[in-house]
Structure formats: structure tokens, C-alpha cells
């Protein structure tokens, strides 16, 4: 996509957009997605905002992590290494879906590195114990991917992430391209993380301004479930008392409503926390 440079640092492939904002925007994609899911949103950001969208470990050209069942903390550590290698000290994290689990873990583990959080279509995680089997939802996705292959898996599921898919075929196609590029190793690792993670615990320790948004027609993380995630954020760190609900939008918020997503990013970047 025009204006985005492909980079590879610390074993991570990413798309980068130049800018001079002191705290760059770092974009973390979801379970069945990739770095380019933020492409249209990044293109819509105002000119001063530097932005970077990674392929999380095991996705695209990024190295997989070195363990079969990584935690959200392991992904956060990989993100910290990317920031270190890129010379980035403090950033604004934008997470979508599964990416919100990594964003929340990063904010808890490395609070000095995170200026603010924007959580789009956040997922709670399943909170399963390490000794427990994978939850049925996660196991079902991994088994379907293994049985069908990436292309068929994408074709069968992409439309479910888009509001009114028959009228938004371009968005469905964009979502499907990301799913079709999934790698078995990275998808399995991310599934294990989704199974064990619990965003409520990390958000309870957030120490930065946080904004939560969801599509009004999101079938994967519907607004009524996202409302419980908002409640986990300490009230004095919420940019808005409640969540932002984006109209006529499904789960693929950054792809279906990139202009609205870009405005949310600007709101978070510009937010000035009140003095204690």
C-alpha cells in the first residue's frame, strides 16, 4: 500500500508509515488477520503520526515464538524487543480483537513504554488453566483450519466479520486475504494464547489512558460483551466512561470503518490525562 514501507526487525515483519509524533502508533492485529488489516486506517491517519503495524510472531514474515503455547506476556516481550530495535521508547498501542490481549499485557508488564491504549473489538480471552484442554471454540477453529486449509477456511468465515457483507464485498475480500495468508504454526500458537489469556486481569492494572470501541453489528465480540471489558479498566484511566460504538460496522472495524478508526487513534494520541 502506498506510503507504507515493509521492514523486518528483531524477527518481526511489519509495515511502517513515517511521521514525527513523539509517541508512534503501534498496531496489533487479530487472530485471523495480518499487518495489512490496518493499511487503510494507517493511510487515513493525519500526516504527523508515525505508525507501525506488525505481523505478530508466526504470522506473515515474522518468526514464530520458541514455545508451543506462548502466553500474552510472551507476545508482549516480542513487541518490546521490536520497540527496542526500532528505537521507540513510548508508544500508543492500538489492538484489534486478539491483538488487544497483547496490548493489555504490554501495558501491564511495561507501563513506562505505553502512553495510551486503543482497544478495538476487544476479546476477553478464555482464561483456561495451562492444564485444561483448549476451549471448544478455540479447538474448533484450529481443527477447521487444519482440515480445510487456509484458503477454504478464509472463504467460509470472512463474511461473518463484516456488517452487511453482500454490500461490502471489497471488505470481505480484504478480510479473506488476511485469513488465507495464515500459517499453521503461528495460528496454533495464537490459539493457545487466546485460550489461556484473560484481559480483565491485565486491564485492572492499566496505568494509562484507555479507549475501547466496537462495531455496532460485531458478531464476534458484540457490544454487550465488550461492555464488561470496559468495566475492567480503572475508571480514572478511561478516556470515555463507556465504549465507543461504531455504527454499521462488524468485527473487522479497521477494515470496514478505517476513517472512523483513524479518528479514534487521533483522539487517543491527543488525549491529555487530567492532573492527579
Regions found by a protein language model. Give the residues of each.
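Flexible "cap/lid" loop of the alpha/beta hydrolase fold
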Residues: 104-109, 113-147
Amino acid at each position: 500500500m502506498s506510503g507504507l514501507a515493509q521492514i523486518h526487525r528483531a524477527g518481526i515483519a511489519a509495515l511502517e508509515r513515517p511521521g514525527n509524533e513523539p509517541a508512534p502508533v503501534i498496531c496489533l492485529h487479530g487472530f485471523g488477520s495480518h499487518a495489512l488489516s490496518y493499511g487503510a486506517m494507517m493511510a487515513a491517519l493525519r500526516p504527523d503520526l508515525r505508525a507501525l503495524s506488525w505481523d505478530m510472531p508466526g504470522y506473515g514474515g515474522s518468526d514464530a515464538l520458541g514455545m508451543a503455547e506462548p502466553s500474552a506476556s510472551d507476545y508482549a516481550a516480542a513487541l518490546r524487543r521490536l520497540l527496542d530495535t526500532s528505537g521507540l521508547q513510548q508508544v500508543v498501542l492500538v489492538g484489534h480483537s486478539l491483538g488487544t490481549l497483547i496490548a493489555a499485557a504490554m501495558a501491564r508488564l511495561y507501563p513506562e513504554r505505553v502512553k495510551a491504549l486503543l482497544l478495538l473489538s476487544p476479546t476477553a480471552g478464555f482464561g483456561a488453566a495451562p492444564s485444561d484442554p483448549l476451549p471448544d471454540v478455540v479447538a474448533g477453529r484450529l481443527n477447521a483450519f487444519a482440515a480445510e486449509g487456509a484458503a477454504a477456511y478464509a472463504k467460509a468465515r470472512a463474511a461473518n466479520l463484516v456488517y452487511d457483507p453482500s454490500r461490502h464485498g471489497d471488505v470481505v475480500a480484504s478480510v479473506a486475504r488476511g485469513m488465507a495468508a495464515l500459517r499453521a504454526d503461528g495460528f496454533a500458537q495464537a490459539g493457545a494464547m487466546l485460550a489461556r489469556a484473560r484481559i480483565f486481569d491485565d486491564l485492572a492494572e492499566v496505568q494509562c489512558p484507555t479507549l475501547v470501541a466496537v462495531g455496532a453489528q460485531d458478531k464476534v465480540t458484540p457490544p454487550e460483551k465488550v461492555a464488561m471489558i470496559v468495566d475492567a479498566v480503572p475508571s480514572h484511566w478511561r478516556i470515555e466512561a463507556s465504549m465507543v460504538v461504531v455504527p454499521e460496522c462488524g468485527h473487522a472495524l479497521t477494515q470496514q470503518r478505517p476513517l472512523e478508526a483513524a479518528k479514534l487513534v487521533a483522539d487517543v494520541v491527543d488525549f491529555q490525562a487530567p492532573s492527579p
